């Protein structure tokens, strides 16, 4: 990002080192944006949509593409493990929200919702617009969110 290849190699010994540094830089900011968007929603059900739409926005902004491009040219088992761990950690606030809502299997439900995020990512990579992808996501998730939204006066448990 702004560095010529020779300059980047002065700082990083290999593509894997560069990618590792990129992941360590991007992931905390990504997770923070998702968590902030979720915290901004007072109702747990609305946090689900915030989780998905924020992830879609981050993908559309391009940070995910840089990591994917580097991973394609410098694949490694360590990177795959690190990436899987970070993606798993991104699910934590979603699982917590689903637990708060009383989901019978929050981990499985979170994986299903995250499947929507992954498919949305592929659609964005396939030249669909962010607006079109978000419209399809809302079409799928808003009925679930409406069904699980608290009624006025219902106490948070």
Q: Language model features by range: what are they?
A:
Residues 21, 25, 35-61, 113:
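Hydrophobic alpha-helical connector segments
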Residues 22, 26, 30, 34, ...:
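Hydrophobic recognition helices of helix-based DNA-binding modules
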Residues 28-31, 50, 58, 76-111, ...:
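Amphipathic alpha-helical packing segments from all-alpha helical-bundle domains
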Residues 45-70, 81, 85, 150:
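Helical hydrophobic small-molecule/effector-binding pocket
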Residues 37, 53-60, 69-75, 140-144:
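Helix-loop "lid/cap" segments that line or gate small-molecule binding pockets
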Residues 13-17, 21, 39-43, 60, ...:
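Residues in soluble alpha-helical coiled-coils and helical-bundle/repeat scaffolds
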Residues 66-71, 80, 84, 99-141, ...:
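Hydrophobic/aromatic-rich alpha-helical bundle segments in the mid-to-C-terminal region
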Residues 1-17:
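Helix-turn-helix
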